[in-house]
């Protein structure tokens, strides 16, 4: 196999997005568009990858890190000019170079591999990825000769009436003999309506020099969608969502209503897990097997163990063990670690807490900045009072502790193993192991008080 290189064009400003966010960084199913492209081209066995950046260069570099080298297009003068900015990295290399736009998040490695194979088998100097569509308005047209060979690519704005009738379009993805590409770029003119240096002109230059120019027509037109505005962004989101949902269902995940279920591109879900309508799974979430998620549940950047149930709840940046029950209407906030066989019930909020195996907070509780042992029962209305208006403090609850209903644990405080806290207590000091702590006013019953009060009011 000859050397393979790729150039990703990601320098466009994206004016039509009408956004402060750089265009190729807009997410599709939770991942920036350009990251989708990089993830796919990285499967092609590349020797070098160069991303051409312009507006928002630093943000793109931060997103992609050391996966790619970068070239700066300080002034946007067209796609040929953009590719030429990679000359310092690639111009002297022998091999095949793939050129693709950073705003095509739906492209797959399989389609690009097919393009590269067509290029190799045809012995071509250039091969363009094309598609056939009924309404090609706005796309460059593929002009072929009487033998069906590619002659040139004409941009929509420069096409004549005959060329506008062509329905085979340029998708903006190409592969070239690397040295032929960079030798041809200097020959590209900007004598066109836009006054730009078009990369498709390289096709005509190579053809006129007698080189073989090939085309690979994909049947997956959706993959070639370029995102230039919010409408196209929403279209890409829907297509990617359906693709992700289908992949999960094929792999053994039950999705009750795929049209109302959203799974990020990087999420991993085990077999025989059921997702109910309104479920949103974001970021790098990993969900085990035999789980039941939803309805109306959001999980972000979290790890969920096998056989866990989460109903109408939110889990962020946390880890849950196996056979955990969460919800309905619970909120597990970042940096929480929930053990196995735990119950987090309705209207319970847990934040930055380690919650031990088989422990439970069944309803109406707030547990923050705490370490909760195993086999602990937190009664209804249990509160860790962790904030004094300036600093956060830790509550430690040992194994086998029983906290009665409507109790406040004022941190920093420790309740040792096996201790009991009576209902209605406000605990401000440590509770020894196996002690009963009662911290509430003693009940006083005043006999016949009501009759005396009512008689007094009558008089």
UniProtKB/Swiss-Prot annotation:
Cofactor note: Binds 1 Mg(2+) ion per subunit.
Binding site for acetyl-CoA: 386-387, 423, 440
Pathway: Nucleotide-sugar biosynthesis; UDP-N-acetyl-alpha-D-glucosamine biosynthesis; N-acetyl-alpha-D-glucosamine 1-phosphate from alpha-D-glucosamine 6-phosphate (route II): step 2/2; Nucleotide-sugar biosynthesis; UDP-N-acetyl-alpha-D-glucosamine biosynthesis; UDP-N-acetyl-alpha-D-glucosamine from N-acetyl-alpha-D-glucosamine 1-phosphate: step 1/1; Bacterial outer membrane biogenesis; LPS lipid A biosynthesis
Residues binding Mg(2+), per UniProt: 103, 228
Location(s) in or outside the cell: Cytoplasm
Main location: cytoplasm
Region named N-acetyltransferase: 252-459
Entry binding sites for UDP-N-acetyl-alpha-D-glucosamine: 9-12, 23, 73, 78-79, 140, 155, 170, 228, 333, 351, 366, 377
Record-level GO cellular component terms: cytoplasm; membrane
Coiled coil location: none
Region of interest (Linker), residue spans: 231-251
Keywords: Acyltransferase, Cell shape, Cell wall biogenesis/degradation, Cytoplasm, Magnesium, Metal-binding, Multifunctional enzyme, Nucleotidyltransferase, Peptidoglycan synthesis, Repeat, Transferase
Cofactor(s) demanded: Mg(2+)
PROSITE patterns (alphabetical): HEXAPEP_TRANSFERASES (PS00101)
Record: active site: 363
Function of the protein: Catalyzes the last two sequential reactions in the de novo biosynthetic pathway for UDP-N-acetylglucosamine (UDP-GlcNAc). The C-terminal domain catalyzes the transfer of acetyl group from acetyl coenzyme A to glucosamine-1-phosphate (GlcN-1-P) to produce N-acetylglucosamine-1-phosphate (GlcNAc-1-P), which is converted into UDP-GlcNAc by the transfer of uridine 5-monophosphate (from uridine 5-triphosphate), a reaction catalyzed by the N-terminal domain.
Oligomeric form and interacting partners: Homotrimer.
Family note: In the N-terminal section; belongs to the N-acetylglucosamine-1-phosphate uridyltransferase family. In the C-terminal section; belongs to the transferase hexapeptide repeat family.
Protein name stated in the entry: Bifunctional protein GlmU
Native species: Bacillus cereus (strain G9842)
